[in-house]
Swiss-Prot record:
PROSITE patterns (alphabetical): GATASE_TYPE_1, GMPS_ATP_PPASE
Record protein name field: GMP synthase [glutamine-hydrolyzing]
First-tier enzyme category under EC: ligase
Source organism of the structure: Thermus thermophilus (strain ATCC BAA-163 / DSM 7039 / HB27)
Known catalytic reactions: XMP + L-glutamine + ATP + H2O = GMP + L-glutamate + AMP + diphosphate + 2 H(+)
């Protein structure tokens, strides 16, 4: 177990994920967690994350100083290195010039850099700088701009690095993290097989012979959860609410795959109910609230008619847990659609087997449980479905237009081998009509926007650089096969400033 103490870095979750990729279990705690809270987890090593603050700020977040004399192996990254150096008597100064972007380690030595030869590219992002290590510590790496790029304690159990080994822009960063894990003697048994074994044991012990209810959306999290319950042999009912806002053939695909793998699945046809409630509504937030309300009503009806159930299983992931426990206010970006808001007379105990897992770990479990790749590798899809990709009022006619266009875009991505190279791809039907030409006549057709992004964690995202030849083929095929669409555009906006979805 390795604990990552979070000082506000945008890369904190990435550090935890990288450690798990190296098969070391990791958890994230607030940077100011007291020593007692840290030791309760029985960690084999600690990592102090980076952060946006300066160690000279009066209210800068700081760790419990007792951590530095706890004897635990320690790695400070960027701001974490500056905290470590300052606390132990080194010298930290406000840098005359900030160091951002790629840099080269022109010198590196010692076991933390074992296996690395020559100049090593790293990613810097700091303003303050350690200019002298603590007494007895050694400088073990430097760049042309920074003579103190990494430091090591006298006993070789604690290190600080001014760069970010966790990011892709430090190509040998995983080797550095792996070296630290070896130096710390951290256990490396966090394999998908081990995780599955532990989850099956947990679910069987917790649920016993009691009944479990869960909602299935067709996404990888809920589908994998349904398979886990089936594999564990617990008495479960998976409810798939067809709200009429699904993609082309989605209901049939989900139904066929899950039933074939032993999931006790109930499909609720609620298309008419949802479309009636959405009639005339154009505001995106209002659409989300209506869909959430109607989903709860449909799901609650099943719970009453098929109950009683003791447990409600949910596919809550570790990032959800981190955000809930963060304690730092954040502006509401969008209303989130979930099974929350159930009536008070429906009381369940929550069963959340994935609460300590990241999305990529759930995908690994899905592979072990036999979930077809068409579902396992499926891009994220919003709970409100196509309702937030049909801008303006949602009608059956506009949904059908979008379904056909979206299917063409997705199929073409697969044909070109691009689907798995982007994190999310979608089509958006705008309420704008544009003039075009059909034969010798002018016609007005809808404007369709295509969007594809690449991202590590969905917190930020970059627009995908799809080949122009691909985009040309997509536009031609869509306008040819979906005559209601007269113009196709491609969204070049990253997140931020935009969100991935348009609504």
């Amino acid at each position: 177990m390795v604990l990552v103490l979070d000082f506000g870095s945008q890369y904190t979750r990435l550090i935890a994920r990288r450690l798990r990729e190296l098969r070391a279990f990791s958890l994230i705690l607030p940077g100011d967690a007291p020593l007692e809270e840290v030791l309760k987890h029985r960690p084999q090593a600690l990592i102090l994350s980076g952060g946006p603050r300066s160690v000279f700020d009066p209210d800068a977040p700081r760790p419990d100083p007792r951590l530095f004399s706890s004897g635990l192996p320690l790695l400070g990254i960027c701001y974490g290195m500056q905290l470590l150096a300052q606390e132990l008597g080194g010298r930290v100064e406000r840098a005359g010039r900030a160091e951002y972007g790629k840099a080269l380690l022109t010198r590196h030595e010692g076991p933390l850099f074992r296996g690395l030869e020559g100049e090593v590219q790293v990613w810097m992002s700091h303003q303050d700088a350690v200019t002298a290590p603590p007494p007895g510590w050694r400088v073990v790496a430097e760049t042309e701009e920074n003579p103190v790029a990494a430091i090591a304690s006298p006993d070789g159990r604690a290190y600080g690095v001014q760069f970010h080994p966790e990011v892709a822009h430090t190509p040998k960063g995983m080797q550095i993290l792996e070296n630290f894990l070896e130096l710390a003697g951290a256990k490396r048994d966090w394999t998908p097989e081990h995780v599955l074994e532990e989850l099956l044991r947990e679910v069987r012990e917790r649920a016993g012979k009691d009944r479990v209810l869960l909602a299935v959306s067709g996404g990888v999290d809920s589908s994998t959860l349904a398979l886990l319950l089936a594999k564990a042999g617990v008495d479960h009912l998976a409810v798939f609410v067809d709200h009429g806002l699904l993609r082309l053939g989605e209901r049939e695909e989900v139904e066929g795959a899950l039933r074939a793998l032993g999931v006790n699945l109930l499909v609720v046809d609620a298309k008419e109910r949802f479309l009636k409630a959405l009639k005339g509504v154009e505001d995106p937030e209002e659409k989300r609230k209506i869909i959430g309300r109607e989903f709860v009503a449909a799901f609650s009806q099943v719970a009453r008619e098929r109950g009683p159930f003791r447990f409600l299983a949910q596919g809550t992931l570790y990032p959800d847990v981190i955000e809930s426990a963060g304690g730092h206010g954040a502006a509401k970006i969008k209303s989130h659609h979930n099974v929350g808001g159930l009536p008070e007379d429906l009381e369940f105990e929550l069963l959340e087997p994935f609460r300590l897992l990241f999305k990529d770990e759930v995908r690994e479990l899905a592979l072990l449980l036999g979930l077809p790749d068409t579902l396992r590798l499926r891009h994220p899809f919003p709970g409100p479905g196509l309702a937030v990709r049909v801008l303006g009022e949602v009608t059956e006619e506009r949904l059908e237009i979008l379904r056909r266009a979206d299917d063409i875009f997705t199929s073409l991505l697969r044909e070109w081998g691009l689907y798995e190279k982007v994190a999310q791809a979608l089509a958006v039907l705008t309420p704008v009509r544009s003039v075009g030409v059909a034969g010798d006549e002018r016609k007005y057709g809808y404007v369709l926007a295509l969007r594809a992004v690449t991202t590590e964690d969905f917190m930020t995202a970059d627009w995908a650089r799809l080949p122009l030849e691909f985009l040309d083929e997509a536009a031609r095929r869509i306008t040819r096969r979906v005559p209601e669409i007269g113009r196709v555009v491609y969204d070049l906006t990253s997140k931020p400033p935009a969100t991935i979805e348009w609504e």
